[in-house]
Amino acid sequence: MKNTFGQAVALTIFGESHGPAVGAVLDGLAPGLPVDEDYIRRQLARRRPSTTLDTARQEQDCYQILSGVYQGRTTGSPLTIVIPNENTRSEDYTYGLARPSHADYAAYCKYHGYEDWRGGGHFSGRVTAPLVAAGAILLSALDRVGVTVGTHILRCGGAWDRPFAPDAAADVAALQTAEFPTLTCEAAQAVSAEILQARERQDSVGGITQTAVCGLPAGVGEPWFDSVESLLSHAIFSIGGVKGIEFGGGFSAVSGYGSDFNDAFRMERGRVVTATNRNGGINGGITNGMDVVFQCAVKPTPSIGQPQQTVDFLRGEDAELTIHGRHDPAIIRRICPVLDSVAALVLCDLLTQRFGTDYLAKEARA
């Protein structure tokens, strides 16, 4: 089981849903980066369930930084964050009954029954909590070099938000203080209604998120196997529930011609820009200086309250299952800060590879 991502800046995650704690280790950080613990708490609060739209499992996420920080700044050694699990209810789960669209059976096949299956174990969304805590440190580092990241709900069920503006910086800034991750109040109300309707039916609903990265310099990334798209996709598909990703215009490119999809170059205030951004800020796997924009398909939460057909893989028998645990009718609201954090990991890694370890700390030390 490999749980580390990144080369110059690497993140390792550990822990299980109903174990003592979950946590993360960040390695390769430059020394001297300020660690804003208030911002870490705000990011964790964005991920934490807080309304009738979310799971009833309430965790306080009282994290502890065990290493890598001294007097409020990174030391350059591995930074370890641990978050205790304080509200578990393992009796809601029955080992051997494979929950449809969950990892129960696949994990049993891979780990030969030695996996911690309670609450989904290491496959649980609970493990995204330390990912978000670590991501907050990375997002702060990016912000100091002028790079910002934001994610909103573009679609949930039949409810739609507007897409990011062509220059997404103002929209991304607004998302940092938004109570709900949409760009319009109307979309927030419509998305909430879709989620509540799914909950009332003992069902769940999925959707589409849209993420924008603003302020990246041109020339970051590699062709072929370590392209910006390749690395973002690799990392983002590690998030449970993500089933698809597209950059810029993505699949809409198939319905037009090159003359429709090409992004024309022009000069603007001494800078090379494109008139449109259908390629999502990436050409040949390398950033071109425009906003990097991508959409993710998020499946409906597989845990629903309706009876479902399954198998008891220990007995080799067909079975029926009704899930009684505490689960989200939709994870699309809570997945937004997770996407920001994973994108920040990839970008910090790429920027450090391109410009060196001290690049992200140069403004902090000035």
Q: What annotation goes with each model-predicted range?
A:
Residues 1-366:
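Generic N-terminal targeting/processing segments that precede catalytic cores or assembly contacts
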